[in-house]
Every structure is written in structure tokens, then in C-alpha cells.
């Protein structure tokens, strides 16, 4: 029952996993449910999925976000063009999964090793990142405990969308091994996708018996792509899901990796997803799960900054590293749930509701974010027309 408490702490995963509870409980026994899943797996195996890869390329082009650069490009070469040199300079560590589309990867052991080595080197090169696993070494900001207590008293999570679904029994009826794979796939699909869309996609996979590594490995990639549509970057995610299933079968006997380094080596898995899966699936807390809400609020509160400067952190991963330097480890799990709810209801991305917030007196960003001049002008023009 590892997931019972853990999943309720991470509402995104809990919401995704809970979407399938009603249908999963309808089965009379677990063995009969497995037999039904096995019968529905009569899908034709297809080793050539290049067409799906082609489709993913065109989809990625329409994104206005910065693409991930292949880790292969990070390897030093003797000679390179001016364009290649510029691309190398623009590359800065591992992008967060929330902020960029999936990068194409061949999923081989060598490519995954290069990906992990690159992450480790970037971690060792940064003075702030070198103390990732050590809590409480940094100087905590003033009044941080008072701020957290004020947010808790506002109880933002009770009104937040992430808490709309009951989470206390999420996934607890599955055998541990199946539950862990279930968590991994659901989390992979959830990035850059609303919870209800992810939940529906996972449910469709379950209806077709495609929530085990064996089933996904045998299924056509096109079938997976159709079932998970319209999650964000569904074509690329279908490719990654197939690769992850193969790796779990070949290297982990159908289970999922249980260390941070091994999870980071999987296609489509960045620091945020790795820490989230590690905690929910294995009940192992090695880092803070930082999404866009936590990233935004920590910068507004002045809790994090770039190493040696007062500049805001530029990515959730930078925020995670900076936050872990001073936040006590006992708060690492709770901080995500608390700030996500706060960010969805009060400290919103655009025009935060400072008027209803109880910590404005100690918040350095209170009432400083106002509508832009252009938006005010549009409102003025609209009112004149009326």
C-alpha cells in the first residue's frame, strides 16, 4: 500500500491514477481482470515504426517552445561549423519536462548513458547543484516559516482542481509491480497535459489491456498513439512509452527503475518526472518535485535565485536545486501539494489575487504584477464601444 499516502501527496499523479479506479474495481477478481487484458492483446507486432517518428517531427515544429537538443550533439568533436558551435553554446543542461517538448532518442543503452552522464556533469559543474542531496546547508529566507503557515491557513488545496478527485485508494488494489509501471506511464503522459485528459488516456490504455510492459511492447505504436490522443505531444510520447516498456522488460524484469539515475536514463524522463515517480512508486524522497506553479511562486517570494546573483531562476530544475539548499527535507513532499493548490487558486500566473491573499505584508511581489498597458487599452476601447 505504498502509494496510498504518496499518491495523495502528489495530486497530479493521484488524479491520473484515480481516473481508472471505478473501472478497475468492476472486475470480480484480479486474475479475471488479467485474463481479460490478455485476451484483448491480440495486436499485431510491428518492429518498423519510422512512420510514427516522421509524424512526431512535424508536430514538434509547430511548438513555439525551445526544442530539446539531442544529447549526442553535446559530445565534443574536433571540428564543427559556426552553426553547430552556436547550438552548443545555447544548450544548458537538461531542460525540464514541463518547459519543452520531448527530444528524439533511439533508446539504446549508449544514448541513455550519454544522457545520464551529461546530467551528472552539469550537476557537478554547478556549485549549487553539488549540494542537491544535502538539505539545510543554505541560508533560509526571512519569514519562510511564517509564509508557509499563512498559505496553509488559507487552505488553497481544498478549492484547487487538483484536489477535486478522491485520492486515498488510488492504485492500491494493483499488485506492487503493476502499480509501479502504472505510475510511470501515467506520469509520462501527464506532462504538458491537463489531468482529465491524461486520466482519460490512461483509462483507454487500460480498456485495451495496454498497461503492462509486455502488452505495450507487443502493441503497434500507432495503436498506442491513437489511444493516448489528445495528450500533449502524443506521437512522441507513444514512441517513448514503447521504448520505456522495452527497457523495463529487458533490464528490470518488467519492473521500473528504482534509483534516480536509472529513471533519468529513460526516454522522456527529466528531473521532475524522475523525482515524482521515485516518491510515488518507491516511497523514496530524494528531491523536491517542482512544477511551473512551485517555480513561479518560489521566485515571487524571493526564495530562490541563480547562484551568486539575485536574478530569478529560469527553470523548474534551477528552482529545485536552489530550494533544496535551505528547505528542510521534512517539507520536501508537502511543499509541492501546498504551492500547486496556492498557484491554481490565489497566486495565479496572470494577475494573481493579492487582494484575497493573507501573506501580502511579507510577500516581496505583492500587488506588483498588474495588467499590461495593452490589456488596459483594450478594455478602455471595449467600454467606449458599449
Swiss-Prot record:
Positions contributing to [4Fe-4S] cluster binding: 347, 354, 357, 363
Q: Highest taxon of the source?
A: Eukaryota
Q: Which residues form the HhH domain?
A: 252-278
Localization, UniProt: Plastid, Chloroplast stroma, Chloroplast nucleoid
Phenotype seen when the gene is deleted: No effect on chloroplastic glycosylase-lyase/endonuclease activity, probably due to function redundancy.
What is a GO molecular function of this protein? Answer: class I DNA-(apurinic or apyrimidinic site) endonuclease activity
Q: Which residues form the active site?
A: 272
Please indicate if the UniProt record lists Iron as a keyword.
yes
Feature: transit peptide: 1-50
| GO cellular component terms listed in the entry, alphabetical order | chloroplast nucleoid; nucleus
Catalytic activities: 2'-deoxyribonucleotide-(2'-deoxyribose 5'-phosphate)-2'-deoxyribonucleotide-DNA = a 3'-end 2'-deoxyribonucleotide-(2,3-dehydro-2,3-deoxyribose 5'-phosphate)-DNA + a 5'-end 5'-phospho-2'-deoxyribonucleoside-DNA + H(+)
CDD domains assigned: ENDO3c (cd00056)
Transcription regulation: present as a keyword of the record?
no
User: How is the cofactor bound, as the UniProt entry phrases it?
Assistant: Binds 1 [4Fe-4S] cluster. The cluster does not appear to play a role in catalysis, but is probably involved in the proper positioning of the enzyme along the DNA strand.
Per the record, the GO terms for biological process are: base-excision repair; base-excision repair, AP site formation
Do you know which InterPro entries this protein is assigned to? DNA_glycosylase (IPR011257), Endonuclease-III-like_CS2 (IPR004036), Endonuclease3_FeS-loop_motif (IPR003651), HhH-GPD_domain (IPR003265), HhH_base_excis_C (IPR023170), HhH_motif (IPR000445), NTH1 (IPR030841)
The record ties this protein, via SMART domains, to:
ENDO3c, FES
Site annotated as Important for catalytic activity: where?
291
**What EC number(s) does the entry state?**
3.2.2.-, 4.2.99.18
Name of the featured protein: Endonuclease III homolog 2, chloroplastic
Lineage of producing organism: Eukaryota, Viridiplantae, Streptophyta, Embryophyta, Tracheophyta
Provide the gene name from the record. NTH2
Amino acid at each position: 500500500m505504498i502509494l496510498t499516502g504518496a499518491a495523495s501527496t502528489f495530486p497530479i499523479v493521484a488524479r491520473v491514477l484515480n481516473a481508472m479506479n471505478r473501472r478497475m474495481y468492476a472486475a470480480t477478481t484480479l486474475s479475471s481482470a488479467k485474463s481479460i487484458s490478455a485476451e484483448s492483446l491480440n495486436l499485431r507486432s510491428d518492429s518498423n515504426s519510422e512512420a510514427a517518428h516522421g509524424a512526431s517531427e512535424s508536430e514538434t515544429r509547430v511548438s513555439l517552445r525551445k526544442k530539446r537538443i539531442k544529447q549526442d550533439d553535446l559530445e565534443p568533436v574536433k571540428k564543427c561549423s559556426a552553426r553547430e558551435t552556436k547550438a552548443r553554446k545555447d544548450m544548458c543542461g537538461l531542460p525540464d519536462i514541463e518547459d519543452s517538448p520531448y527530444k528524439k532518442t533511439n533508446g539504446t543503452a549508449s544514448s541513455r548513458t550519454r544522457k545520464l552522464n551529461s546530467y551528472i556533469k552539469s550537476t557537478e559543474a554547478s556549485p549549487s547543484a553539488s549540494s542537491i542531496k544535502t538539505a539545510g546547508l543554505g541560508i533560509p529566507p526571512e519569514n519562510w516559516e511564517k509564509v508557509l503557515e499563512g498559505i496553509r491557513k488559507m487552505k488553497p488545496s481544498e478549492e484547487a482542481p487538483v484536489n477535486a478527485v478522491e485520492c486515498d485508494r488510488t492504485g492500491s488494489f494493483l499488485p506492487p509491480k503493476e502499480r509501479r509501471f502504472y505510475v510511470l506511464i501515467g506520469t509520462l503522459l501527464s506532462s504538458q497535459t491537463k489531468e482529465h485528459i491524461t486520466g482519460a488516456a490512461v483509462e483507454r490504455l487500460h480498456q485495451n489491456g495496454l498497461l503492462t510492459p509486455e502488452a505495450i511492447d507487443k502493441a503497434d505504436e500507432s495503436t498506442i498513439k491513437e489511444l493516448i490522443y489528445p495528450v500533449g505531444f502524443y506521437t512522441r510520447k507513444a514512441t517513448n512509452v514503447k521504448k520505456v516498456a522495452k527497457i523495463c522488460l529487458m533490464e528490470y524484469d518488467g519492473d521500473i527503475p528504482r534509483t534516480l539515475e536509472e529513471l533519468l536514463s529513460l526516454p522522456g524522463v527529466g528531473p521532475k518526472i524522475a523525482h515524482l515517480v521515485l516518491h510515488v512508486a518507491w516511497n523514496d524522497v530524494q528531491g523536491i518535485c517542482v512544477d511551473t506553479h512551485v517555480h513561479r511562486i518560489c521566485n515571487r517570494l524571493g526564495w530562490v535565485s541563480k547562484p551568486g546573483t539575485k536574478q530569478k531562476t529560469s527553470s523548474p530544475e534551477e528552482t529545485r536545486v536552489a530550494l533544496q539548499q535551505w528547505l528542510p527535507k521534512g517539507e520536501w513532499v508537502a511543499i509541492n501539494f501546498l504551492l500547486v493548490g496556492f498557484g491554481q487558486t490565489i497566486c495565479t500566473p496572470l494577475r494573481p489575487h493579492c487582494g484575497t491573499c493573507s501573506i501580502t505584508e511579507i510577500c516581496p511581489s505583492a500587488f506588483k504584477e498588474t495588467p499590461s498597458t495593452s490589456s488596459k487599452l483594450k478594455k478602455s476601447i471595449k467600454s467606449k464601444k458599449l
